[in-house]
Design a protein with these regions (language model features):
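Terminal targeting/low-complexity segments that flank the catalytic cores of oxidoreductases
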Residues: 1-109, 130-146, 152-159
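Acidic/histidine-rich alpha-helical segments that form the ligand environment
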Residues: 78-85, 154-186
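Short, conserved catalytic/metal-binding motifs centered on acidic residues
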Residues: 86, 118, 201
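Histidine-centered active-site/metal-ligand motif
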Residues: 121, 197, 204
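Carboxylate/His-rich catalytic cores and anion/metal-binding grooves
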Residues: 112, 116-136
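Inter-helical turn/loop segments and adjacent helix faces that build the functional surface
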Residues: 96-108, 132-136, 177-196, 211-213
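Transmembrane helix-bundle signature of multi-pass membrane transporters/permeases
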Residues: 114, 196-201
Length: 213
């Protein structure tokens, strides 16, 4: 009896957590143009990534302009990598949602919203690439294909993919809170992109833990 009661209590707790996630998602919903971009542009007179992430301050042979340019190139790659991993994350969450189609509808809604957020993030990072690419020097190449990476990752077990996803979303939060948010010298739009990204991922990581069994 105790084991049955514990199981039922756990299922009830999980249902409550899914419900809270859905409520939070509805309150925090944002749109790229309406809430973030608003016809803004990147400030190329500033660094994009903080030195704490880029480690550019260790390259003492660079002058100020060179260090700033390298920070912007690294910021461009940083955004590209997030766009790349969002591809397999959105696909995996859609897969997870299928398990709830005839079961917990709040869990299904939470996962569909999660997937929609990841698709929105991919669009945002593509927009960033276009905007940054029009100002930065020619010659920059992106080698990894998001679909190839997604296929390779999704070939692993569900446990492994959810573990990877959870850890990615944990370091997203750490990077933003500890390294990006406190730095006033960074490009304001670059900071805001990762502020909005962080808002979603702080909710997503709770779903990762619920699905990661």
């Amino acid at each position: 009896m105790n084991s049955v009661a514990t199981l039922l209590s756990s299922e009830s707790d999980n249902a409550d957590r899914y419900a809270r996630i859905v409520r939070s998602a509805k309150k925090a919903e944002w749109q790229i143009d309406r809430d973030l971009m608003q016809e803004r542009s990147f400030d190329f007179s500033r660094k994009f990534l903080p030195d704490g992430l880029s480690q550019i301050d260790r390259l003492t042979f660079l002058d100020g302009a060179e260090a700033r340019l390298l920070s912007q190139i690294q910021g461009r790659t940083y955004a590209y990598l997030f766009g790349l991993v969002e591809r397999f994350i959105s696909a995996k969450m859609l897969d997870q949602g299928r398990a709830h189609v005839f079961d917990n509808q709040l869990a299904l809604e939470a996962l569909v919203r999660f997937s929609n957020d990841e698709i929105k993030h991919q669009e945002l990072f593509r927009r960033m690439e276009t905007m940054m690419g029009s100002h930065l020097p020619a010659g920059y190449r992106q080698v990894a294909d998001p679909n190839d990476v997604a296929r390779a990752v999704l070939a692993a077990s569900t446990w492994s993919v959810l573990a990877l996803t959870c850890h990615i979303e944990l370091f997203v939060q750490a990077h933003y809170v500890q390294s990006i948010a406190p730095r006033e010298e960074l490009c304001p739009l670059f900071k805001d992109v990762f502020k909005f990204h962080w808002k979603d991922e702080s909710r997503h990581v709770v779903l990762d833990e619920l699905e990661w069994k």
